[in-house]
Amino acid sequence: RTTSSAASDVYKRQVYFDKIKQCLKPGKQATLQIITIQDARWEVYRKSVDFIQKYIFPGGMLPSPSVLRKEVHRAGLSVQHSIEFGKSYSQTLRRWFEVFNNKWDTISAMGFDDRFRRMWNFYLTSCAATFESGNCDVTQITLQKPDNN
């Protein structure tokens, strides 16, 4: 990952949270669901490109919890509520893996090949392990735009 792409990631996050603030009326809230990467892993992660960034979500960049909160506050929003449920999401990914493979005949009839199957099996199982281990998390966060009073 280059310095310019890292700067682009910061800019995109700033634009995103600024737009949320712009769209909210004073005192109103927005709830987001965001996947985060551990703070301890953030510096290494942001400087590299992993399998998911290359093949599943090209150009994607997960925030860490502290980066997420920093951007929220920079945009002038406040965090009203937050819950994390990565371990539960791991079970969801394992279920998607089962359904995907149980429906493989239907999927392959649409023209998808074994390479596609292996790629998605790797994605689903590696993500399940990542959430189970706590290296990534899923956060639902409720943000509020300040009241004008």
Positions of PLM-derived features:
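A short glycine-rich, Lys/Arg-flanked "PGG" loop and its adjoining helix->strand segment in the class I
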Residues: Q14-G27
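Conserved strand-to-helix beginnings and helix N-cap segments that scaffold or border functional pockets
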Residues: R13-Q14, L93
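Glycine-centered flexibility sites
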Residues: D9, G27-K28, G59-G60
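Single conserved hydrophobic/aromatic residue that forms the stacking wall/gate
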Residues: R1-A7, Y11
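Substrate-binding/catalytic lobe of Class I Rossmann-like enzymes that use SAM or dcSAM, i.e.
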Residues: T36-N149
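Conserved beta-strand signature within the Rossmann-like core of class I S-adenosyl-L-methionine
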Residues: G27-I35
